[in-house]
């Protein structure tokens, strides 16, 4: 028999709130390992569902900015380059680690890997990588959403043993399209009503609709 779906969603019916069934932090402090979180940082991540690390690996910002500008020109005819729904302005670039040796090396940097391994209590792999360009004046918003709900329903990820590492390459503030989060929302799963059409991602990557 197939395993029970602990987080059913988009199977018709109505919306519902399901309490998280999985731990948030699987590992512990590792003072002997470089680039890991201390006790207070682990507690903050466990309670809030995210943690911000200012000035983390600042030497990588300029090289990554330059590399992304190269990808924006070299990947014009690739399916992995997603444009805005009403223009040719670039919205996202998927799998940049596949097309860029620099980004591939960066994705393996201990400053990322050691924290991810600590939080998940295991070795890790990349299930999805992307660059969100969000061009000034032309860029469109990303609606409120749960990454895991999409990964679970559309990609088949069974449990919440996953995380997102987000590298801010520009100042993130209230007037340039910042990322908003709801502290503590990771403790509940929002099960969505309705169903999902085949290849929903073809449209949702360009424009998100409730």
Model-derived features: where do they sit?
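Short, conserved beta-strand element in jelly-roll/cupin
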Residues: 119, 152-174
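Short C-terminal domain-edge/linker segments immediately following a structured domain
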Residues: 82-87, 157-163, 194-202
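Internal hydrophobic scaffold segments of catalytic domains
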Residues: 1, 58, 66-69, 170-182
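Short acidic/polar capping segments at secondary-structure boundaries
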Residues: 131-138, 148-149, 169-174, 184-188
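Double-stranded beta-helix
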Residues: 172-210
């Amino acid at each position: 028999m197939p395993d029970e779906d602990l987080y059913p969603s988009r199977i018709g019916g109505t919306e519902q709130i399901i309490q998280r069934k999985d731990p948030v932090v699987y590992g512990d402090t590792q003072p002997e390992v470089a680039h890991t979180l201390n006790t207070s940082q682990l507690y903050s991540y466990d309670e809030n569902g995210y943690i911000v690390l200012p000035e983390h690996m600042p030497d990588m910002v300029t090289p990554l900015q330059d590399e992304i500008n190269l990808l924006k020109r070299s990947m014009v005819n690739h399916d992995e380059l997603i444009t805005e729904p009403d223009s040719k302005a670039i919205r996202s670039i998927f799998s940049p680690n596949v097309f860029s040796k620099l980004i591939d090396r960066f994705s393996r940097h201990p400053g990322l890997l050691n924290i991810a391994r600590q939080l998940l209590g295991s070795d890790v792999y990349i299930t999805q990588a992307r660059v969100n360009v969000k061009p000034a004046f032309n860029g469109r918003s990303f609606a409120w959403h749960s990454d895991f709900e999409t990964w679970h329903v559309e990609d088949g990820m069974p449990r919440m043993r996953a995380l997102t590492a987000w590298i801010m390459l520009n100042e993130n503030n209230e007037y340039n399209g910042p990322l908003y989060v709801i502290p503590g929302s990771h403790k509940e799963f929002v099960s969505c009503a309705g169903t999902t059409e085949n290849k929903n991602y073809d449209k949702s990557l360009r424009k998100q609709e409730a």
